[in-house]
Amino acid sequence: MGMPAAKKGDTITATDVHFIQPPGTAPPTTVQHPFKGRINGNLSANVNIMGKPAAMMNSTATNTPAHQPIGGTFVKPPANRGSIIAGSPTVFINGKPAARSGDTAITCNDPVDLPVGKVVAKGTVFIG
């Protein structure tokens, strides 16, 4: 059986790691930050899932609330963006793999963005 199809308003979740510069002369440290972004960009203009634009590979999410520095300042300000990098191998929307619950997303991390995010979708439309 397939997985729920992703659409506008579904989420990408992850745990991101960012470098924080503590006050004074201490070296930067890594701090984990939760990522929870609503899928809201690069959606299909002509395919809807449950009345909302369908998500596909390369659809994006904005982390809300944005990451906040804990114990100092960010060495590099986070982008607070996620992008779906995997989808269905058999179902395509506008020529791109359809996104489903459980598909992988890349999210903002230091020193480089990493594929640690997962799509979380609910609904009545399932895609294999």
Segments (PLM) and residue ranges:
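Intrinsically disordered, low-complexity proline/glycine-rich segments
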Residues: M1-G128
